[in-house]
Swiss-Prot record:
Keywords: ATP synthesis, Cell inner membrane, Cell membrane, CF(1), Hydrogen ion transport, Ion transport, Membrane, Transport. Coiled coil: none annotated. Transmembrane segments: none annotated. The gene is atpG. It is a peripheral membrane protein. This is ATP synthase gamma chain. It comes from Bordetella parapertussis (strain 12822 / ATCC BAA-587 / NCTC 13253).
Length: 301
């Protein structure tokens, strides 16, 4: 059995660790609220762009934008969104598992893959498996910078428009609630005809699409022309989806980190209680032994 001094040192060490995890939990909780606000703030913009773009395409059905054209898939692009740091539970492990499964599926179908990594964890994974990396962006911080994101994704979008890849996917973690984050592997391009939002419920998306289809007899005045407006709107819509993928992952990261640090703090508290019990028993045994020795010595005298 360890001595009293050794147990006291262990208790002090665990107490210090608990202070750290408790502080990290509080920081993550604060960042989580801000990340959720940013995530939700982007949704109205994406919804309105989707509505206008859907209306324009219904009013101009003869125009087939490359982002909407389905073609035989021989090569694809994959955008993997992960965190830069750890200590966020199984967040990165889960999305990595889903991504590896999809990459294996593409390999079995003889489909070429080129990848873009957002976050150090994803970059490390793609490097280890020898994936073809065409762009990367790490150290994104707590707030996604759209210019940096677009700089990294431009290679993939250009390759799609020029026919070097036939589809573009994004692997990220969708924020459901504070306790639940869901790894998802979504097709970014080509867009579906209804311009469904992959980060919102299917019921809401279908309702919005039905609403647009039921009332498109009116029209806008386009400057310079409808084709140019559709091109610009679809480009912005795809950029918005990419931003949303990163924002969802950041909100999921802070939620997962807060939960992980709370669990660590609770476990540390339990360990401290167990060590305190052992300390008390050891101290009591030592006192009892000393008393027995004193009584034994007195009896011998």
């Amino acid at each position: 059995m360890p001595g009293i001094k050794e147990i006291r040192t262990k208790i002090k060490s665990v107490q210090n660790t608990r202070k750290i995890t408790k502080a990290m939990e509080m920081v993550a909780a604060s960042k989580m609220r801000k990340a959720q606000e940013r995530m939700r703030a982007g949704r109205p913009y994406a919804t309105k762009v989707r509505e206008i773009a859907a209306h324009l395409m219904q009013a101009n059905p003869e125009y087939g934008h490359p982002y909407l054209v389905e073609r035989e898939v021989k090569a694809v692009g994959v955008v993997l969104v992960t965190t830069d740091k750890g200590l966020c539970g199984g967040l990165n492990t889960n999305i990595s598992r889903v991504t590896l499964s999809k990459l294996k599926e593409f390999e079995q179908r003889s489909i070429k893959v080129q990848a873009t990594a957002f976050g150090n964890k994803g970059l490390g994974l793609l490097t280890r498996i020898g994936a073809k990396l065409v762009s990367q962006e790490v150290q994104l911080g707590d707030k996604p910078d759209l210019d940096r994101l677009l700089g990294a994704i431009k290679v993939q979008l250009d390759d799609y428009l020029e026919g070097r890849i036939d589809a573009l996917y994004v692997a990220t973690t969708r924020f459901v609630n504070t306790m639940r984050q869901e790894p998802v592997f979504l097709r970014l391009l080509p867009l579906s005809n209804g311009l469904d939002d992959p980060f919102q419920s299917g019921v809401e998306t279908l309702a919005k699409t039905a609403e647009i289809k039921s009332d498109y007899s009116w029209d806008y005045i386009y400057e310079p022309d409808a084709k140019s407006v559709i091109d610009d709107l679809l480009q912005r819509y795809v950029e918005g989806l990419l931003y949303q993928a990163v924002a969802e992952n950041m909100a999921s990261e802070q939620s997962a980190r807060m939960v992980a640090m709370k669990s660590a703090s609770d476990n540390a508290k339990k360990v401290i209680g167990d060590l305190q019990l052992v300390y008390n028993k050891t101290r009591q045994a030592a006192i009892t032994k000393e008393i027995s020795e004193i009584v034994g010595g007195a009896a011998a005298v």
